[in-house]
């Protein structure tokens, strides 16, 4: 069999549209229902993580791209964290709470997180996608370089996920 070239741009547009439709209360129609069971999503997600090969960085960057290109469009810069929390809840990613906000640093809590809710203590953080989503969304809205690192996770036996968000001084765009 010959190599089949995947149309990554078409897939990217499809994912972007599906997320936008979900946020706008128009999820794609499907005979079996619009949502997959959390256990199936987590099985695939954790299966990918166990493959190794630096996949965590890839998952983080996917989250960052989606945050920057999709989620940020629905977040109000003047009401940044509150509107971001609304979007994450609406997209069923998790319930965002603010623990600390300073000029160049935040600590954000994510409860009922899609990647690790009800996961047993496996000894490591699991929410690289959510960390990327936080970084990408805030980076786009603040026009500053942002990095988010998960410091607490249900995958480490914690009750919720916690992210340390570092914001660089330099403005861009």
Swiss-Prot record:
Q: Which domain of life does the UniProt lineage start with?
A: Archaea
What would be one Pfam family of this protein? V4R
InterPro entries in the record: NO_sig/Golgi_transp_ligand-bd, V4R
**Family named by the database record:** Belongs to the M.jannaschii MJ0150/MJ0739/MJ0745/MJ1460/MJ1642 family.
Name of this chain's protein: Uncharacterized protein MJ0150
